[in-house]
């Protein structure tokens, strides 16, 4: 059911814009979770406003690209998804959205869909992928999201998790004090430490 829907159109959720942190900031473990996970993603920032943007014009609205670690409380997410309304507390807590280490403009990046991606936990490679593995390009996503809805400068769109880019796939979750490094060619390394109060 989910795969059929995802192949038919881009699926997305809107994250808490107040829960964003940057490179080298600590992720604070949410009190209600025992299964914290990372997601190897990248994303784009909107630079020009627009509504009903065509796929052909979408790239003109992209200001730049960065790396995105979509931290997820998998136990909470698992309970919520049965309600078929998307993630809530599984992805909505302070420090859940890690972005950085910089913003790379489209002219600096060149082809955005041929960049190698790697995730390391405590210095050990966990998984790798390529930006070209996206089912829907950012052009597709912008065209879809902007239907009858204005996109504003500063809005951020994530790619979705790259294959082998999360612990969920291997049922290996984070531990307190783990250090996660997400690397995307031509963008850099996004480093984050997990702390538990």
Indicate residue ranges for each PLM-predicted region.
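Active-site microenvironments in enzyme catalytic cores
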Residues: 1-125, 195-197
């Amino acid at each position: 059911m989910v795969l059929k829907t995802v192949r038919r159109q881009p699926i997305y959720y809107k994250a808490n814009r107040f829960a964003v942190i940057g490179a080298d900031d600590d992720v604070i473990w949410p009190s209600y979770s025992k299964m914290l996970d990372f997601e190897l993603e990248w994303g784009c920032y909107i630079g020009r406003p627009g509504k009903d943007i065509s796929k052909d014009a979408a790239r003109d609205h992209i200001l730049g690209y960065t790396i995105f670690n979509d931290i997820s409380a998998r136990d909470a997410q698992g309970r919520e998804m049965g309600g078929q309304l998307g993630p809530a507390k599984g992805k909505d807590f302070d420090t859940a959205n890690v972005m950085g280490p910089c913003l790379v403009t489209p002219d600096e990046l060149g082809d955005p869909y041929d960049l190698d991606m790697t995730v390391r936990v405590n210095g050990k490679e966990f998984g790798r992928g390529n930006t070209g593995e996206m089912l829907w390009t950012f052009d597709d996503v912008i065209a879809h999201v902007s239907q009858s809805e204005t996109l504003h400068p500063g809005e951020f769109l994530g790619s979705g998790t790259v294959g082998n880019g999360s612990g969920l796939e291997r049922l290996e979750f984070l531990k307190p004090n783990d250090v996660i490094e997400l690397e995307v060619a031509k963008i850099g390394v996004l480093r984050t430490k997990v702390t538990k109060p």
